[in-house]
Each structure stands twice: as structure tokens, then as C-alpha cells.
From Swiss-Prot:
Record-linked Gene3D superfamilies: Nucleotide-binding domain of ferredoxin-NADP reductase (FNR) module, Translation factors
Native source species: Mus musculus
Keyword terms: NAD, Oxidoreductase, Signal
Binding site for NAD(+): G177, V178, G179, I180, N181, P182
Molecular-function GO terms, alphabetical: oxidoreductase activity
Domain of life: Eukaryota
Claim: Lipid biosynthesis is one of the keywords in the record: no
Signal peptide as annotated in the record: 1-16
Residue span, FAD-binding FR-type domain: 60-171
Gene Ontology cellular component list: mitochondrion
Keyword Transmembrane helix: no
Name of the featured protein: Oxidoreductase NAD-binding domain-containing protein 1
Any one Pfam family match given in the protein's UniProt record, by short name: NAD_binding_1
SUPFAM superfamilies linked: Ferredoxin reductase-like, C-terminal NADP-linked domain (SSF52343), Riboflavin synthase domain-like (SSF63380)
Length: 311
């Protein structure tokens, strides 16, 4: 896990129907405590999320959430939109949640892919979960339905949270597979910051943002329409380069200008190195290790390299 900054309030340790009103539901506090404590006690696998992230900062707030929309993002990935009524629940772009499921002893860990502003405005967060034999992923793909209730707790030291007085920074986002999730949150947050700055002139002034995103094929490039919508909305600020490693089908005319056959290369990343640029990397451990070490070998300061590995 990358260390970026300490956050006040943290402690260690198919499309559905329209969302209902936040105030109309909620797990009882006693039920919430029982659910989370039972999951923590039973979740003991050495490879599980809680053990891997035991030393990572977490917020103290444990919040109930209700599933209000389910979407197939790709053949192997489902996204969930969850309504979180608790106004004390918040997160930084790039963070993840401990995902507590009633009746499932193993705790999931899923990165948030929506922006903090979406939560503030609509009380909605979005997660994208790839199918695996891990119990939380099995539940998401096979048992989760509209109105399913879970509990969430925010954690993570990988985030982008500039303050209005901070100097503008360029961002290079390097994603592999479902590693796009926290980087999409950062991308969406950057777009929100740019809108606020253009409208009000008093929020953080974002620099340029370039996304490099690699997947097996274009059907596994998650949220590509949302990404291209941001590229088209802010052509002078946001750009993207999709990479596919095992493409067999024909690429659509709309997507083709943005797609490169083959992996993301060192040269592509090296060409964007500057004193004003921050690098965020998230993907399979070998990819994350490769690019973080490459950037260090190019004398990029360690404090400008933020990375997170997901298993």
C-alpha cells in the first residue's frame, strides 16, 4: 500500500431501479455491530483483506449501505451503486471500503470508483467487483440483489485530496484490470475539481490528467464510455490511452483512436516525467512493482509515486 498522507478521523486497525430515499431505511446499530464484529472474528485467512490491510489507516465510521443499482460492466465485472445515508461517512478519491456482508464471514475489500462529490450530492458510492472464488465476490455476482444491505468502513492511504491553496499538479494514472477503480475515482474527482474551479474560481486548480489503462481486451476495459465522456468534456485537461494485450474482436470506430495493441511501455510513462507530475499506479502486483521501480530509476521522488496492489 502506498503512503500519501495521514487523514484526520482515521484509525488503524443489469441496471436496477432508481435509488430510494436515504432516510427510509437503515440497519439497526446492534445489527451493524454484530455483523462487523462477527465478520472480523471469523475472517482469518492469511490472504484475506483484513489481514493484508491490518496496518492501514481506516476511518472510525461504520455505515450501513443499501444496494440501489447493479450493472454488468464487463463479462467478468459487476458494479454496485450503494446508498449510504450516514452523513458522517466520507472518503478521499482513491480509497477503498471494508465490505461486510450479512451471512458471509469473510470481509471484502473493494476500491470506490465514484467521486467524493457524488457521495456529498447524492449519498451514492460505486464499486466494481470482478468475479472470483473469494466469498465476497461470489456474493456480489450470485446473491446480491436490489435492496441488499451491507456495512462499509473506509480505509486506505492511496488517495488524491488536494487543498484549494495547493499548487497545481499534473497526474499520470496507470491502471491494470480492475486497478482502474481507485484511479477512476481520482479521475472523476479531478473533473469535479475542474468544474468547480471553472464555475467558482475558488477550488483547487487541477493540472493535466493522463490515464494509461491496460486490459486483456476492449470488453474488459471498464467504464470506457465514462472515461471518454470526460476526455471529450475536458479535451485540454484530460486524455487517455487504452492498451489491450489479447484483442481478437474488431475495435469500434469510436474507441479505435484511443486503443494501442500491447502493454503500456516505459517510454510512454517516461515521456511524462516532470517536477509537477504525480504518478498513481494500481493493478496486479507485478505491474505495480514494475512501474513504481521504473519511476524511481528515473529519479522521480518517492513522494510523487503513489501505488496500490490488489490481489
Amino acid at each position: 500500500m502506498a503512503h500519501v498522507a495521514l487523514i484526520p478521523g482515521l484509525s488503524r486497525g443489469s441496471v436496477g431501479a432508481v435509488c430510494t430515499q436515504a432516510a427510509s431505511w437503515g440497519l439497526k446499530a446492534s445489527t451493524l455491530r454484530h455483523l462487523t464484529l462477527a465478520s472480523i472474528i471469523k475472517s482469518r485467512r492469511k490472504t484475506d483483506h483484513l489481514e493484508r490491510t491490518a496496518s492501514v489507516l481506516r476511518r472510525e465510521v461504520m455505515a450501513a449501505a443499501k444496494v440501489c443499482e447493479i450493472t454488468h460492466e464487463s463479462p467478468s465485472v459487476k458494479s454496485l451503486r450503494l446508498l449510504v445515508a450516514d452523513k458522517d461517512f466520507s472518503f478521499k478519491a482513491g480509497q477503498w471500503v471494508d465490505f461486510f456482508i450479512p451471512g458471509v464471514s469473510v470481509v471484502g475489500g473493494f476500491s470506490i470508483c465514484s467521486s467524493p462529490q457524488r457521495l456529498e450530492r447524492d449519498r451514492i458510492i460505486e464499486l466494481a467487483v470482478k468475479y472470483a472464488d473469494h466469498p465476497p465476490a461470489v456474493w456480489v455476482h450470485n446473491k446480491c440483489t436490489l435492496d441488499s444491505e451491507v456495512a462499509l468502513r473506509v480505509g486506505g492511504e492511496f488517495f488524491f485530496d488536494p487543498q484549494p491553496t495547493d499548487a497545481p499538479r499534473n497526474l499520470i494514472l496507470i491502471a491494470g484490470g480492475v486497478g482502474i477503480n481507485p484511479l477512476l475515482s481520482i479521475l472523476r474527482h479531478s473533473a469535479d475539481l475542474h468544474r468547480d474551479h471553472a464555475d467558482k474560481g475558488r477550488s483547487y486548480e487541477i493540472g493535466t490528467v493522463k490515464l494509461f489503462y491496460s486490459a486483456k481486451n476492449t470488453s474488459e476495459l471498464l467504464f470506457k464510455k465514462d472515461i471518454l465522456d470526460l476526455v471529450h468534456e475536458f479535451p485540454e485537461k484530460i486524455s487517455c490511452s487504452f492498451h489491450v494485450t489479447k484483442q481478437t474482436a474488431q475495435i469500434s470506430a469510436e474507441l479505435k483512436p484511443y486503443v494501442t495493441d500491447g502493454r503500456i511501455t516505459e517510454k510512454e510513462i517516461r515521456d511524462h516525467i516532470s517536477a509537477e507530475t504525480l504518478f498513481y499506479v494500481c493493478g496486479p502486483p507485478p505491474m505495480t512493482d514494475f512501474f513504481s521501480k521504473h519511476l524511481e530509476s528515473c529519479h522521480v521522488p518517492k513522494e510523487h509515486i503513489c501505488f496500490e496492489k490488489w490481489w
